[in-house]
């Protein structure tokens, strides 16, 4: 029995009491399964699960919470799967499951396989998840590494919770930066220094060499004639490098949207016209302004300059409407720490478009990241490249560590820790638990222990109860992590599961202990049932790691 199953049972008991007239009808709205919360008590002596539902409903029921708890306990006692119900303190309910009910979860998990933990709490939600969106003028760096790991993990969690998700990369390929980029590559083609304000780094020379291979005669052209050729080729080659780097990091996008296409297709002019028709545009000082102060921004924003050129903000507005027109109910932006000023203006765009800024747009601002002892990349112009971090620390360690902390907390990566094969290294600790469970299954098979029998009532050891309880909470953790956009909830829970597994592994044998003279003892139902629990744990660990883009090794 999982916590959500117990919540549903408690809800049914309370509903029956209302129907019988023992509780007032006014309680009905507050006793849905979603509102009846259960949690693991701090002390095992207080049962398997606890709830404060009587404390929450006592006043509305016109009863002392302890009396209400007693009524619920009386009705809950004797229900299938319930071993004991105790009232504690001012009205807490402590529930102990019978071993068969708790242990049945092991078989349920094994039979569900990769589907265990997936849920439908966000079914019907259409989500556009935009992240990374680095300029195509250089390699991905350390900051992009964090947004890639977090954004991809959030997208995986949303999908696991039933949402229809599109992972999107917005390519900032318009504006003067692309001209500066092209001029930098062009300068290197001719052996010149990059222009003032240009892009340094050996990667620019590499791009120049690659462009020359594609276009052998490019050096014979004038700069004016060569510039569009160089710009197109260097942009395409750099974007391919970005895509290859992301793929090596196991981060995948469904859509790459070009900012330039918004200009070329007339989408920006159309967006301005739509906003004008809705009454949110003002012409003054020769420019076109969006009245964002009407929606909480600190000042109005220019869309079209007096010289007729659209601003970057105009592209932002057109891009938001582009997402909206594609049917996305929720637009999630994962932006860097230098984008705090974008929050109000993006929400103003949403409001001006007729959306609810509280529900239709979500802006996650990530904080800075640093790495102790990292070497700056001369190739990239004294930055730390994503591909170098992956090569140095390993994809799994890096992705896990980046997902382990809230996006809005500054993070310093400890390479020595992440490269260590010790229990102090969180990713090693979790992956080792999976490898240990996989190894235990191989050992069991070699000794004739299989899953041909299962008796959940035999899983009575205290470590088995704890392990089952943590496995039972996994689906709710996944749902909460998706709803709150917080992958770190999954990492922390996996560490709890790993700890519970290691304790169980030390206390309970799957393969029977031989006699003192080495004679093998016969395999019993308990041994086979424990193999189910072992394999269930391996499955949950693999499922959780997969949601983070981290592998689940079978050997370490």
From Swiss-Prot:
It is an enzyme of class 6 (ligase). Keywords: Aminoacyl-tRNA synthetase, ATP-binding, Cytoplasm, Ligase, Nucleotide-binding, Protein biosynthesis. GO terms for cellular component: cytoplasm. Transmembrane segments: none annotated. Its EC number is 6.1.1.19. Belongs to the class-I aminoacyl-tRNA synthetase family. NCBIfam families: argS. HAMAP family: Arg_tRNA_synth (MF_00123). Monomer. This is Arginine--tRNA ligase.
